[in-house]
């Protein structure tokens, strides 16, 4: 251990257990930001366990977990060198199962860490500090920087776990039960939850709540124990080091399954979204929203995990948290806000806006003012012609709603665009000939190229509701027509402050064309290469 003087007295004894850490172990926190210049590492754990008893007297100790793991491995030792077992699972705490008091916890670290270092030194091996100088371990001078990165259990990684034959019992149902459970009030034990599986974070939060472990400890206990047990059977398993899970380099080497089979857990293919909070509605409700046919199956394919929408539980948004008027369970976020808030990644509109920011879509959408809505855009989701009052909503069964949603989704037809051959092949923009000749715009080629990028997008198909919708990316504020008016019919030669600060014709052309090129990350023509579009006049 060449950097022994900077290793904490926690010593060479902490084993593999923390290796799958999502955020750290027990009261120790993984450093998420660089703590100093030097070698980047994903295994820097700041040991600050004593803060549970009050203000720390010394700065936390920076502990390089993987470096100690390697040292233990050379000695033929494993996780049990540092971690005791509880109910056949290794505890995340160092050399103890419970924190009794500050003195005993402090003594546990000092005695075992320094003791281990002394043993190694006596055996002629390199080791960490063995003296009693506090600054040998409690130092602000950490010769490393953190490159720790959270790991995401996406669909591919989840599928590899459910389909794995390496998990002790094997088979999908058994594999699910290895991680997913619920608390049985009668037996006061954790039991499997077939058909009710949800994200771990639905129950395990960032902090400990009553007797429920936080997500940090729950993840380490479940994941690391499984990896260690599978590795002991000489079978393929997940990472056994912090670096293996939490460095960007190693995450980039994780095998990705491209076509992940749909995981069927009794979820619906289609959902009819209505105002479920019928208690807040009266028979004469004037603002009752029209139903939305939600393609649940398509959204599963478009997202890495269920938490993209179900961020607290698998129950429907309106039934569980978000009511018409707002409720404490939903953070007082109303149903309308949960669905429509533009800047939220958890709302429908916010998520769609994020997808529209992709370069294939941004050429048009980056130039459309946020928040612009119309009856046509609302009708993309809220079905026209289907009027349901409060009485009808209350009378509909779950099966009726599913059938109606499925029929509405089936009836949706992609609008496409106008016949390409009917569009002008070229358009010469010559309104402002001065120093340069008019710009020859390859209209048909550009339409074909841009449309090909979104033609297979289900999101685009759902919201491009007429053949002219696609054209309105350029021909904005105009009727969706095969023959839209010329730009000069709205944009005068000069800036007009009296008409919503409408830019002049020259500015409008450059803003539209260069703005689109920039949003789509096109290198040519460059914004400053005037002659690439306009031939200079002789």
PLM feature spans:
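Cysteine-rich micro-motifs
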Residues: 113, 132-138, 198-200, 223, ...
């Amino acid at each position: 251990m060449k950097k022994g003087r900077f290793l904490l007295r926690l010593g060479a004894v902490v084993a593999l257990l923390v290796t799958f850490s999502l955020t750290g172990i027990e009261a120790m926190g993984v450093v998420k930001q660089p703590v100093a210049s030097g070698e980047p590492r994903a295994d820097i754990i700041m040991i600050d366990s004593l803060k549970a008893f009050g203000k720390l007297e010394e700065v936390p100790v920076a502990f390089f977990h993987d470096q100690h793991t390697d040292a233990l491995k050379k000695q033929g030792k494993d996780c049990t060198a540092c971690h005791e077992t509880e109910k056949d699972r290794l505890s995340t705490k160092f050399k103890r199962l419970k924190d009794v008091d500050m003195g005993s916890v402090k003594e546990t670290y000092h005695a075992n860490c320094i003791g281990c270092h002394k043993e190694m030194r006596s055996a002629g091996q390199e080791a960490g500090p063995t003296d009693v100088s506090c600054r040998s371990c409690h130092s602000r001078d950490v010769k490393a920087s953190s490159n720790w990165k959270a790991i995401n259990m996406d669909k591919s990684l989840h599928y590899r776990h459910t389909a794995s034959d390496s998990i002790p019992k094997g088979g999908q149902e058994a594999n699910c039960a290895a991680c997913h459970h619920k608390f049985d009030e009668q037996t006061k034990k954790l039991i499997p939850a077939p058909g009710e599986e949800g994200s771990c974070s639905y129950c395990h939060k960032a902090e400990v709540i009553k007797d429920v472990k936080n997500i940090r400890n729950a993840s380490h206990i479940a994941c690391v124990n499984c990896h260690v047990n599978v590795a002991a059977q000489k079978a393929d398993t997940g990472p056994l080091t912090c670096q293996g899970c939490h460095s960007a380099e190693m995450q980039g080497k994780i095998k990705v399954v491209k076509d992940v089979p749909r995981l069927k857990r009794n979820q619906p293919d289609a959902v009819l979204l209505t105002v479920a909070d019928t208690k807040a509605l009266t028979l004469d409700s004037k603002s009752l929203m029209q139903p939305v046919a939600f393609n649940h199956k398509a959204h599963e394919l478009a997202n890495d995990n269920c938490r993209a929408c179900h961020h607290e539980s698998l129950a429907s948004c309106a039934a569980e948290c978000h009511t018409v008027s707002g409720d404490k369970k939903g953070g007082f976020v109303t149903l309308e806000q949960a669905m429509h808030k533009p800047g939220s990644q958890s709302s429908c509109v916010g998520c769609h806006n994020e997808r529209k920011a992709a370069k294939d879509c941004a050429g048009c959408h980056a130039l459309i003012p946020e928040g612009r809505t119309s009856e046509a855009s609302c009708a993309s989701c809220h079905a026209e012609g289907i009027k349901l009052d409060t009485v009808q909503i209350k009378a509909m069964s779950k099966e009726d709603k599913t059938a109606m949603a499925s029929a509405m989704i089936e009836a949706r037809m992609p609008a496409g665009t106008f016949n390409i051959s009917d569009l002008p092949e070229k358009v010469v923009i010559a309104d402002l000939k001065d120093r340069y000749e008019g710009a020859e715009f390859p209209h048909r080629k550009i339409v074909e190229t841009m449309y090909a990028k979104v033609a297979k997008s289900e999101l685009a198909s759902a919201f491009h509701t007429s053949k002219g919708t696609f054209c309105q990316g350029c021909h904005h504020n105009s009727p969706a027509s095969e023959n839209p008016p010329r730009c000069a019919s709205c944009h005068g030669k000069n800036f007009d402050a009296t008409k919503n600060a409408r830019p002049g014709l020259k500015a409008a052309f450059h803003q539209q064309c260069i703005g689109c090129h920039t949003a789509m990350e096109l290198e040519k023509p460059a914004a400053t290469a005037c002659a690439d579009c306009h031939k200079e006049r002789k």
